């Protein structure tokens, strides 16, 4: 039985955060990167402004040969990884945005809690918790794509694994313009369930924090409920696929099953991979993700 419960003021809290963010101009900047541009893919460094006026960096790739308006994919990073340059997605026919939320490389001048520490930074106060701005940084990535004349606004997808999988869930929930989503081994889903099921980092950061500050447990539980992907899941309306590893000791599969049950979309599919840990069957699953996005964003036949 999951411990995840949605706070009564969950919607009001995030509506207020969105109001604060919408009052801040996006101020997008797109800088050509000739060093990383090739014959078939144009590469740019992108910057835009997010909550608390923090500048967020991203890599932006687009096919040299493309339609006037092209489908787009936003890629979201894992907890300890920095965003890759998404040229392989551009070669598949998409415009691709690889976002570096606050604290990641090139987005860490104004906010840099480090790793480990992001997960517990201000964890006793939902109004200042690190993931409050971190989530908005990713949602503003969709806003950036919608601002680009070369992007087809009705064909935007989002994907990521681990932390990127959790961010895929929250982004699909909070940006209705997302047409399709693929979340792998989703982290940030079932926080308090996970800390009881695993003693592997990053979730172990929360156990460490509560051992040092035992009086904080109630405040920690209260805060993370507002950021738990499971509490966002019923807002998801777009087609979505989720893959989990049944031997995952980083993001326990129990949390993946709970998440999937709560997803509101009618078009949803869960892929559980036995014999796999936190990789969540990535090698086997990549072709499924490719077919899924090709069907929903490129109108190409394929089954996912």
Regions found by a protein language model. Give the residues of each.
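Acidic catalytic loop of the alpha/beta-hydrolase fold
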Residues: 246-251, 279
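Histidine-bearing beta->alpha loop at or near hydrolase active sites
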Residues: 270-281, 288, 292
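Short beta-strand/loop motif that positions the catalytic acidic residue
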Residues: 236, 242-244, 248
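Cap/lid segment of the alpha/beta-hydrolase catalytic domain
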Residues: 84-136, 193-194, 200
């Amino acid at each position: 039985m999951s411990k995840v419960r949605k706070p009564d003021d969950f919607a009001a809290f995030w509506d207020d955060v969105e109001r604060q963010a919408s009052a801040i101009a996006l101020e997008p900047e797109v800088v050509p990167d000739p060093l990383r541009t090739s014959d078939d893919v144009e590469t740019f460094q992108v910057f835009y402004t997010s909550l608390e006026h923090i500048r967020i960096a991203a890599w932006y790739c687009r096919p040299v040969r493309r339609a006037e308006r092209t489908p787009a994919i936003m890629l979201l990073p894992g907890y300890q990884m920095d965003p890759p340059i998404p040229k392989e997605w551009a070669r598949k026919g998409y415009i691709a945005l690889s976002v570096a939320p606050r604290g990641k490389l090139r987005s860490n001048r104004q906010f840099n809690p480090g790793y480990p520490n992001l997960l517990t930074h201000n964890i006793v106060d939902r109004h200042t918790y690190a993931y409050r701005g971190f989530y908005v940084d990713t949602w503003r990535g969709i806003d950036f794509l919608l601002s680009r004349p070369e992007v087809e606004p009705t064909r935007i997808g989002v994907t990521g694994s681990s932390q990127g999988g959790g961010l895929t869930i929250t982004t699909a929930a909070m940006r209705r313009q997302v047409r399709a989503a693929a979340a792998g081994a989703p982290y940030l889903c079932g926080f308090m369930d996970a800390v009881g099921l695993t003693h592997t980092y990053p979730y172990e950061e929360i156990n460490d924090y509560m051992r040092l500050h035992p009086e904080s447990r109630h405040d920690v539980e209260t805060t993370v409920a507002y950021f738990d992907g499971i509490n966002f899941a019923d807002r998801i309306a777009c087609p979505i696929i989720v893959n989990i590893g049944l031997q995952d000791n980083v993001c326990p599969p129990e949390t993946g099953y709970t998440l999937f049950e709560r997803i509101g979309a009618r078009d949803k599919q869960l892929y559980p991979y036995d014999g796999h840990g936190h990789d969540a069957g990535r090698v086997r699953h990549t072709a499924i993700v490719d077919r899924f996005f090709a069907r929903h964003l490129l109108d190409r036949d394929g089954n996912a």
